[in-house]
Each structure stands twice: as C-alpha cells, then as structure tokens.
C-alpha cells in the first residue's frame, strides 16, 4: 500500500512540475533586422575578427562614421551577447578606446548605444553584470524546479 502511495505522489509531482518545464525558451540569437545583418559583417571583420586589440585605420574610420542604427545593432546583437560572438566587454572596450569612440559604444544591450554620455568618462566594461546572459535565467528556473521536485519526493518517501 505504501508503495502505491509513493508512486502516486511521484506521478502527481511530475505532472505538477511538467508545465513549468514546457514553457518555450528564448532563442540564443537575438532578433536582427535585415539592415543590421547586411551592414555589420564588414565592420565586424575589420575590427573584431582580427583577434588583436590594436585596431586598423579602416576599423577606426568605420567605427567613427557608424550611424546610430549600426551602433545599436553592434551593441544589442554582438557586444551585449558574447554567446553569439567572441566580442566580450573588455575586448570591445580596448578597441573602441584606442579608436577614441568608447563613449559612443559603451552599451549594455538595451538599445541605448550611440547616445552621448553626460559628465566624464565611463568606467563601465560595456556589460551590465547584474543581468543573466543568454537564456534570461531559464537554466536557474529549471534547476530550482528540479530541486523542489527532489525535496518534495524525498519528503514523501520519508513519510510513507
């Protein structure tokens, strides 16, 4: 009889937690406009694909002449999402600082790139360290659900 109760409790918990795990997950790649997808590869190749923190003249010229749309595209889709590309905050900061456009490209993935900052230079690394990256904390949600399931299942087994 106790074994039947344990099975029933485990099945109940599995059915109760399953809808939480079935929520659609966000995509790894951010949404990108067609303009962003066609314009950015050239700039990315000139500036960030070399692996060097010393930018070329062509790179600096392109960074200085970039429109606000291009800045927003670079910030939101590449700098703020290192999972998509290898452009990390410190690497981006090194290149944009040497080109003299750090204030223009100091962004955090919130479509605010290209806005001039008021009052002095920024010491930001180009990322918001308080945010989770990639999946918006979905992995933590799954881990918490599984931990709760394990806790409840062990309590049920101890009781019966």
From Swiss-Prot:
Region spans: Disordered: 111-136
Entry GO CC: plasma membrane; side of membrane
Membrane topology field: Lipid-anchor; GPI-anchor
Disulphide bridges: 36-75, 47-59, 60-99, 73-107
Lipid attachment residues per UniProt (GPI-anchor amidated asparagine): 135
Signal peptide: 1-22
Compartment(s) of residence: Cell membrane
SMART domains linked: AAI
Gene3D superfamilies linked: Plant lipid-transfer and hydrophobic proteins
InterPro entries: Bifun_inhib/LTP/seed_sf, Bifunc_inhib/LTP/seed_store
Residue ranges annotated as propeptide in the record: 136-160
Carbohydrate-modified residues: 86
Assigned keywords, A-Z: Cell membrane, Disulfide bond, Glycoprotein, GPI-anchor, Lipoprotein, Membrane, Signal
Source organism, top-level taxon: Eukaryota
Annotated Pfam families: LTP_2
Entry keyword Lipoprotein: yes
Similarity comment text for this entry: Belongs to the plant LTP family.
Reported function: Probable lipid transfer protein.
Name of the protein this chain belongs to: Non-specific lipid transfer protein GPI-anchored 28
The species this protein was found in: Arabidopsis thaliana (Mouse-ear cress)
């Amino acid at each position: 009889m106790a074994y039947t109760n344990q099975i029933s409790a485990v099945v109940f918990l599995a059915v109760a937690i399953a809808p939480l795990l079935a929520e659609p997950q966000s995509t790894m790649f951010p949404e990108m406009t067609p303009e962003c997808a066609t314009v950015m590869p050239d700039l990315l190749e000139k500036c960030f694909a070399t692996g060097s923190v010393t930018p070329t003249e062509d790179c600096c010229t392109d960074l200085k002449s970039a429109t606000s749309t291009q800045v927003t595209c670079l910030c939101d889709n590449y700098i703020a999402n290192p999972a998509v590309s290898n452009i990390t905050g410190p690497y981006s900061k090194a290149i944009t600082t040497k080109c003299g456009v750090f204030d223009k490209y100091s962004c955090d993935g919130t479509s605010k790139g290209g806005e001039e900052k008021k009052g002095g230079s920024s010491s930001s690394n180009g990322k918001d360290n308080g945010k989770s990256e990639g999946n918006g904390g979905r992995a933590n949600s799954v881990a918490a659900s599984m931990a709760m399931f394990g806790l409840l299942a062990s309590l049920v087994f101890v009781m019966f």
